[in-house]
């Protein structure tokens, strides 16, 4: 009887943890810098995110934002936000991470090299990542292989490259950042793809999902498939980070995030 009660309690706790990652203050805001129609600066952006109740940010950038890197870090600290992830990598940012003692995930697209066999492609893709694998290890940062289409965006290939780096380069800090807006080809087999990737997932970014990616970027709750896909995520026991997007150049980031927060809440009810 005691053993049965213990198993039930463990299951209940696991379910609670999986649900907690959908709480507003656990969600990661993504694609909120260059895509913001209002072109906010660091202080305005941090204040807006805090006002929305979001506390984690994955920072994407363009060349014009390099001079703002440190101010972005300082404003996040001031407003109680977690600098959760950083796009691609930049030595000035790495210097600042060391200075301010922060360790965000680094997200980088996995390339799609040509080779004569699947094994050779996996090895070649891993090879292209090695400088960043080493640099992130030195910084104490996790490295997320990011799906952005092509061979390198396929769940099975992301997993294979992760496994290769873990086995041959002792790179246990490498995982997967999977984006639904680059994953329309896996709507039909989402449960299988999620099961493959789950042990390696560092973040899972949500999006409204229609057949044929029409449109590619869509608010949560307005698509045909994201409710079913989110249900699968919750049932899988995945308890890691969940991201929501702006990614719409013509829209105020605050509005885009609000729409996704509202859509997500309707799905979760």
Question: At which residue positions do the language-model features occur?
Answer:
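Sec-dependent N-terminal signal peptides
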Residues: 4-13
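Histidine-acidic metal/acid-base catalytic patches
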Residues: 20-28, 40-50, 131-134, 138-140, ...
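Active-site mouth loops of central-metabolism enzymes
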Residues: 28-41, 88, 113-122, 218
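Conserved beta-strand positions in the central sheet of alpha/beta enzyme cores
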Residues: 31, 58, 84-87, 105-106, ...
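Active-site-proximal loop/turn and secondary-structure-junction residues that shape catalytic pockets
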Residues: 34-36, 63, 89-91, 110-114, ...
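Catalytic domains of carbohydrate-active enzymes, especially glycoside hydrolases
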Residues: 42-65, 84
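Active-site-adjacent beta->alpha loops and helix N-cap segments on the catalytic face
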Residues: 65-72, 154
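Active-site acidic/histidine proton-transfer and metal-coordination neighborhood
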Residues: 82-83, 87-176
């Amino acid at each position: 009887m005691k053993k049965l009660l213990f198993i039930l309690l463990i299951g209940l706790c696991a379910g609670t943890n999986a649900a907690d990652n959908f709480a507003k203050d656990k969600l990661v805001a993504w694609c909120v810098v260059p895509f913001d129609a209002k072109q906010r600066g660091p202080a305005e952006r941090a204040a807006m995110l805090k006002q929305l109740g979001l506390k984690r940010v994955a920072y994407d950038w363009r060349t014009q934002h390099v001079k703002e890197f440190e101010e972005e870090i300082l404003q996040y600290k001031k407003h109680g936000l977690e600098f959760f992830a950083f796009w691609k990598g930049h030595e000035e940012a790495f210097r600042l991470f060391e200075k301010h003692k922060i360790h965000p995930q680094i997200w980088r697209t996995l390339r799609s090299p040509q080779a004569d066999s699947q094994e050779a492609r996996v090895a070649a893709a891993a090879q292209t990542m090695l400088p960043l694998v080493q640099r992130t290890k030195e910084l104490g940062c996790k490295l997320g292989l990011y799906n952005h289409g092509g061979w390198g965006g396929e769940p099975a290939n992301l997993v294979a490259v992760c496994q290769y780096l873990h086995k041959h380069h002792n790179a246990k800090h490498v995982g997967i950042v999977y984006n639904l807006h680059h994953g329309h080809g896996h709507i039909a087999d989402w449960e299988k793809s999620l099961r493959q990737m789950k042990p390696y997932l560092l973040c899972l970014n949500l999006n409204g999902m229609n057949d044929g990616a029409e449109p590619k970027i869509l608010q949560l709750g307005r698509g045909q498939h994201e409710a079913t896909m989110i249900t699968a995520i919750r049932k899988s026991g995945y308890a890691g980070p969940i991201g929501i997007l702006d990614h719409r150049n013509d829209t105020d980031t605050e509005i885009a995030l609000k729409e996704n927060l509202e859509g997500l809440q309707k799905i979760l009810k």
